[in-house]
């Protein structure tokens, strides 16, 4: 097993121990492809994100490819593009280092912020 492949497997194993049932391995050959479901920890969140990440042979020395989807369509597409841009920047920042957990945390933090904004707006409307 190559060093990159071993690093990838170790990172995925560690991530599974942290986020448990919110992640699954979709493919393991020829490259790892993982799926994460991410939503805010607030009660009854409106938004849910699906992140699919494919690790190329050279990951983490080369950034992974990813696809992000906001499942419930609560966000404007421009906001989703902003989040994708944040993820791309994060991937560039973490070149040569494990970054899957950072990607997860980036989306979770974004979801928390947006959910709080939605709650505020709903409360304002109810007044």
Residue positions per predicted region:
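Glycine-centered motif in EGF-like
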Residues: 2-26, 59-127
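Canonical SH2 domain fold
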Residues: 33-70
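N-terminal ordered "arm"
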Residues: 16-42
